Amino acid sequence: MIVIPAIDLKNGHCVRLRQGRMDDETIFDADPVAVAGRWVEAGAERLHLVDLDGAVRGEPAHEQTIHAIARAYPDTPLQIGGGIRSRETALRYLEAGVGYVIVGTRAVREPAFVEELCREIPGRVCVGLDARGGYVATDGWEQTSEVAAVDLARRFEDAGVAALIFTDIGRDGMMQGCNVEATRELARAVSIPVIASGGVSSLEDVRSLAGSPEGIAGAIVGRAIYDGGLDLATAIRTAQEVGDDR
């Protein structure tokens, strides 16, 4: 399992939200490119970028910043979500050097879009399953659909999706621990690799996920590495050690 640091972008800054609320933010740094460099230096194998403003608007708001990070660290794959609701946006990101695009809102409203995108750019499309009470949220988490996260995941079983990024919104940014059981339940339901997100805040969370018999593919860490409660290099090393022992 790989540990993936998150960089959330809002108004040009690197921020963290609590439970996805746009009015409850903490600004951690005004230079997202420098933040990316810090995590790469700590050993990150991949970076998770979220365009928060883009997620709400439905179109990219931090495209140039993301392109700059891709140029600065070409050997570190980026996965980017937030506002990717068209083929053109996805292709622009890939052409700029982004490794993976994450489709969330449109995956809920139009699953066929994901299937078509997977055919055009196989192995480069992830689906963001941002769940509130088990149901997928959309539009920057401002709306909650009637689609169960597990049901949507099963829909993409044969589509060629690179990974499912599962976030328990209730845990996100709250430092209360990851919902390991819900993540494992999703991983049991499908053969698509599952990446955990939301609430990963301690080495115990990392150990629980990395040691899951279902084989969780990754864990995204956010607020804990910014607050100093979790050292990224130690988390990466711990995940590797647990994986070696499995």
UniProtKB/Swiss-Prot annotation:
**Which pathway does this chain act in?**
Amino-acid biosynthesis; L-histidine biosynthesis; L-histidine from 5-phospho-alpha-D-ribose 1-diphosphate: step 4/9
The SS bond pairs are: none
Gene3D superfamilies per record: Aldolase class I
Q: Which residues form the active site?
A: D8 (proton acceptor), D130 (proton donor)
Stored PANTHER family: 1-(5-PHOSPHORIBOSYL)-5-[(5-PHOSPHORIBOSYLAMINO)METHYLIDENEAMINO] IMIDAZOLE-4-CARBOXAMIDE ISOMERASE (PTHR43090:SF2)
Superkingdom, taxonomy of origin? Bacteria
Q: What are the EC numbers?
A: 5.3.1.16
Return the protein name.
Answer: 1-(5-phosphoribosyl)-5-[(5-phosphoribosylamino)methylideneamino] imidazole-4-carboxamide isomerase
Indicate the principal place this protein occupies in or around the cell. Answer: cytoplasm
Recorded family membership: Belongs to the HisA/HisF family.
As its record notes, the protein acts as a catalyst of: 1-(5-phospho-beta-D-ribosyl)-5-[(5-phospho-beta-D-ribosylamino)methylideneamino]imidazole-4-carboxamide = 5-[(5-phospho-1-deoxy-D-ribulos-1-ylimino)methylamino]-1-(5-phospho-beta-D-ribosyl)imidazole-4-carboxamide
Provide this UniProt record's keywords sorted from A to Z. Answer: Amino-acid biosynthesis, Cytoplasm, Histidine biosynthesis, Isomerase
Which GO biological process categories is it annotated with? Answer: L-histidine biosynthetic process; L-tryptophan biosynthetic process
